[in-house]
Structures are given as C-alpha cells and as structure tokens.
Amino acid sequence: MACELKEFLVKNDMYPMGDQVEKKRKAISKMTEYIQQWGKKIYIESAGVADDTDVKAATIYVYGSYRLNVYGNNSDIDACIVSNSTITRDDFYDGLYAELLNNPDVKELKQIPSKRSPHLSMIYLNIEFDLNFSRTAYTSLPDNLDILNENILKNMDELDTRAINGVRNTDIIDAFVPNHSEEAFRVMVRTIKLWTKKRGIYGYVYCFLNGISIEILVAQVISENYQLDNVRLLEKFFQVYSSWDWLRTPVMLGTNDDFNDKKKEGVIQILTPASPSENAAFSITKFSLEMIKRELKRGQEIVHEFSSEGVNDWAKLFKPRHLFCGYYIFIEFIVTSSSLEGLTTTIGKFESGLVNLMKGLSEIEEIIEANVIPNGFLDEENEKYFYYVGMNVKRDCPVDISTPLNSFLSIVNSGKDLIVDASIKKRSEIPTKFAHSVKRSITKSQEIKETSSQVPSSAITETFDIPTKPSIEQQLKAKEENSIPNEEKKEQLKKEMKQEANTIVKNSSTDDDFMKRFTRKN
C-alpha cells in the first residue's frame, strides 16, 4: 500500500519530474549570483568605496519545501535575501523591484504588501520564486554564517526576524526529524499537503493550514512513531490530530520558551521552533477549525479502513470536496483592475486582507459558519476575479456584517490598483460557469506565500465540483453529460453531497430567510 500511495503522489505532481530538479537548481544558482551582485553594487554606492572592494553584502538562503526536499513538480521556491547593514528594506522592496522589472528573465513580478511579511513574487527562468528580506548587523556577511546562532537576530526588527526565521525554522524542523525517518517525513508532508488542497483546507490567507504548519504536524507525529511505515504513520497522523485538544494544547517540536507568550495568540497554536516563535496557525478561525476537524475525522475513518481491510483506493482519501455544499448564503467579491496583467499582479493585496475579514465575521454571534472558498475564479475574458465566503446563520436573528466587511473593503480599495465590489448571493445565484467542475487555471498570484508568519503567493490549479441550488439536480445533469454509466452512481452522488451538506448545516436559516434579515450598512 505504501508503494501505491507514492505512485498516487507522483501522478499528482507532488514529486519533481523530468528536468524540473535541474531547472530549479540552475535558477537558484543564477538568482543567488544576481542578488550577490546587486548587494555589492548597493554597498559600493552607499559606502562610496572602490568598485573592486571585496565585500559580501547580500546572498540568498532557500527555505521551505525545497530546502526540506518535499517540493513537487510545480512548487515554487521560497528564498530569503540576507543582507549586511548597508542595504535597507526600501532597497529591496522598491529598488530591487525596479531592477527586476527590466530583467528579461523575470516575468509576472509583483510586490506583495503584507504587513507581516512584504515580499516580491515572480517567475524567474520559468521557475516561481518568492523573495523576502532580512537585514543583519554585519558590515560584510561571513562565508560561514551560522544561520541558527541567535546572535544573528541582533538589531533586527520584527520583519527582518520573521523573514530569516523562515530559514531557521526549516533547518530546525529538518534536524528534529530522525535521520532514518527522513524519507517517511517527505512522503507524509507531500501526502498531507495534497490532501489539504484536494479537500479545500489549505492556505494561510484562507484561514486554513499552510506549508510550515503541515511540516510541524508531521514532524511531531514522526518523532514519536518513527518505527511505523508510511501507511501506519498516515493513520497515526489522522488518529492523533482528529482527537487533539486544539483549544488547550499547542503543537510544538520539543519544548518552546515562547509558549506562555504565544498561547493566547489565535484560536489554536502550531508553534514554529525558531526563537522568537510564531503561531503558524494564527489565521485559523473557530469556523475553519471546525472544517479542519471534520476533514481530519473523515481522513481517519478512510485510512483506518485502508489499513484494516487492505484497501488501497487512495483516490477516495483525496477526492475533491464539494466546496459550496452546505452554505445557504455567500459574500461574492468581484475584483477588477485596469488590465488582466494588473489584476494578476495585485490580487495578493486582496487575499492578504481575508484573514482579518474572517476573524471579524467569526466574532458575530449570529453567524454559525463562515469560511472562504479557497482560491478565486479567474474570468479571463472579462478580466475579473470572483471570490466567495460561504455562510450560515442562526434562525430568526438580524445579522449585521457591516463592520468587518466595510473595514475590509476600505483597505483593499484604498489604492488605485484594485477595485473590489461585494454583494450577498443566495446559493442559487452563484454563476453557473462556476457551478460544475470549474477549473481555476490561475496564475501564480492566486495564493500568498506560506511561511510560519507570512502569507503565500503561489497558485494551484485545481478542479472542484461546486454545486449550486438546486445542487443535486444540476450536478446530476452535468454528470449525465459526461456519461455516468448507471443509476447507482447517480444515487451515490446524491448521498455524498447530502452528507457533506449535513456536516455543515445545523440550525441554520434558509437563504431566502437570511436575505430578509441581512444588514450591511455602506
């Protein structure tokens, strides 16, 4: 069964194929050379020294999935530019950005204006990169710089520390995994990442799990169950976390000196290992937590069946979830810009604000469920992105979402680069072009880059079956057009969709009822 699992992961691009390994290696090498030359030029101009001055003013440290060797065929590269004291964040965010605009090897360059981790995103030599920045106190970076030595954090501000901790966290996680369990760790991380994406519970900006939180969760389970094979480890993963006391017990690797300071940050805590620790699960809300817990329970039941009965139908575990199923009301966001290129370049600004919106909605007592539908829908012909938040509310109560919604809109509409409109839609009003097997072939701007504390900016192209009201009839019609062979499969589809809806909808009002009581003050 372990072999079949790995084969399934390979088929779903969770391993690099063909020449991708060499292409990524060359792109990293060229990017490192470019940044070192850029840093030296900035230093010479700022310090007024001779052009032949021997100084190492900047270099690159790769981290995340690539550094841990858990990257897939289409994975991007996370990298941190570590500089000397001469180079400033403005030199990086604005100066380097301006230079890269004129670099013929760079495409889809964009600034991601996250308050927690502003960074640059691009395609360089046909490889997706996300670059952030950390400034050290060194005049010249030593060749043998010890990235894990806490002295490196001296005189760093919060953004610098957070950026370099992306590298430090990766190295600590790598060291935490026993040597003989490295391959099991890589298989498990790929498995859980694919599972979360297929089941619609992946993405920091969508208030779900991100890359580093998955790596920490997996490393913790493996450290205590290193004797198990891959399938048993997967079963143990679901068993442990489906019964975890998330509200009281943080997940952390070993001891954590920052535990007392971090235990009140966020609904749950998945603490990064490098000091100062961050909560990798800070964006998760009480609503998205319930969704994650339901999916963990489902995963446990399926993998236990595989393990106990010798079944290896891995497609069942990774079957895409009907993302719109179970919600009566949606907030629809239509995002436009001056051009399609401008839209894909600046969509990160919209996504970076979703966490605060969802946290605001989670504080409204009348709302019993509110989650982002992960990823947006790109309407290339009309140059628009569509995003949705699914909601259910208590019966017979007025509902006012003005405060969080208007606050969100004021922020994302504050510049000239984006125009965001919001409206309330019943499930039956979701555009039919998004209703059946929608393929979101969206460029890299879809997601904001995931680290322990920054938001992601890479995209995934995924196919989900998304029902609208009347969802079952419409879905069956679509399936009939694709030649469903028999009545048994139709009935199975009905059963699956009703089950998914019933896991969410409890004591919720209908969409028509909600529309009568909904309040949004402009």
Swiss-Prot record:
GO annotation, biological process: mRNA processing; RNA 3'-end processing
Stretch list, region Disordered: 475-522
Gene Ontology CC annotation, any one: cytoplasm
Composition skew (Basic and acidic residues), residue ranges: 476-499
Binding positions for ATP per the UniProt entry: 63-65, 76-78, 130, 193, 202, 211-212
Compartment(s): Cytoplasm; Nucleus
Recorded catalytic activity of this chain's protein: RNA(n) + ATP = RNA(n)-3'-adenine ribonucleotide + diphosphate
Record function comment: Polymerase that creates the 3'-poly(A) tail of mRNA's. May acquire specificity through interaction with a cleavage and polyadenylation factor.
An example Gene Ontology molecular-function term: metal ion binding
PANTHER family per the UniProt record, alphabetical: POLY A POLYMERASE, POLYNUCLEOTIDE ADENYLYLTRANSFERASE
Bound cofactor: record note: Binds 2 magnesium ions. Also active with manganese.
InterPro entries: NT_sf, NuclTrfase_I-like_C, PolA_pol_cen_dom, PolA_pol_NTPase
CDD domains per record: NT_PAP_TUTase
Protein's name in the database: Poly(A) polymerase
